[in-house]
Amino acid sequence: MRKTICSAACFCLLLVFAINAEEVRVETPANIQETIDDVLRDFYNKYSLPGGISMAISYREKLVYAGAIGYADKDHKIPLTPEHRMRIASLSKPITSIAVMKLVEEKKLHLHDEVFGDTGIFDGKYGIPEYENDSVKITVKQLLEHTAGGWGNSRRDPMFSVRNVTGDEFIRTVVKEYPLENSPGTKYDYSNFGYCVLGRVIEKKSGMSYEDYVKTHILKPCGIDGMRIGGKTSEPDEVEYIGVSGQNPYSVSPLHMDAHGGWVANPIELLKLLVRVDGFSNVPDILESETIKTMTTPSAQNNGYALGWSVNRSNNWWHTGSLPGTSTEMARSSSGFNWVILVNFRPGSAPEFSGDLDRLFWTIRTAIQEWHTGTEL
């Protein structure tokens, strides 16, 4: 049901969330809260979600909504709240991109640095990739753009097909046994493995673990203390993940997927990060404006993808994520709205699910014509 909301009408609903041991007070007019809750509830009911859906929205870099429908743990009847953390899957890729761009600003890294081979970032540690029996050079920028030439979703994704090896041996095995399908820099092919390698680039150039560098240099300046790389089990502040069609959410290891799909967060935390890399002026960004412009400029091989972000001609940036038991979206729009949606469920067969998830905010935007001031993030 669509409604037109006027910000002058009605009282405010005060919600207080304890995020990172600090209270986030969200004052949302009750009719706006009800309208958004109704949109989320319609989605929840349409797909008979066995878990729940949480969402946070900012306007002009202030929090205007944080809410959730459904369960964090249905078996124990624990309601979902925006405080509950979830695996965010590929929303981890923009986080990794932000970390790489911070290293570029620190002059510890260049986008055109070669990654493999004796003269590369790893000093030949992992060998060198081959294309048609010839050694090739892959750059940091190509990994960010998914144009490295191989290891993509269109064929075999080595992140999920190479088993029983981890760490350095895992990367060495992939480079040796998975020759490239294309010359680097010539074709887009979405690659989880490429972002796994970027995590190791961050470690090499920073002298810190990937997780520690991101926490110290990206999240802490945003006032975020609770995000982490997940594990095979759920922590007390984390939801239970629900698998369908024989999928076991706890068979995947977020630790192995750290830089491409391993982070655990709640929607307010992600929004706090997003408003500090969105290029708007109300909240200071943690990256310089030219760095953000570079990060969100589409590649020559795919005008819909930049460096870790999907982009379009409307100057909107976003990313989606999907794992067994997880569906996610994070977006920045040129109109001043940012939003994060997290679901602790992924359907086995529902081709319209991701499209409906993406349309949630636009349905809300159509229903609400005027917005209140919001709360500092």
What are these regions (language model features)?
Residues 22-68, 203, 220, 248-377:
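Catalytic loop of the DD-peptidase/beta-lactamase superfamily, centered on the K-T-G motif
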Residues 55, 60-62, 87-110, 114-115, ...:
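Alpha-helical scaffold elements that line and support the substrate/ligand-binding pocket
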Residues 130-132, 154-235, 261-271:
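Catalytic-site signature segments of enzymes, centered on catalytic residues
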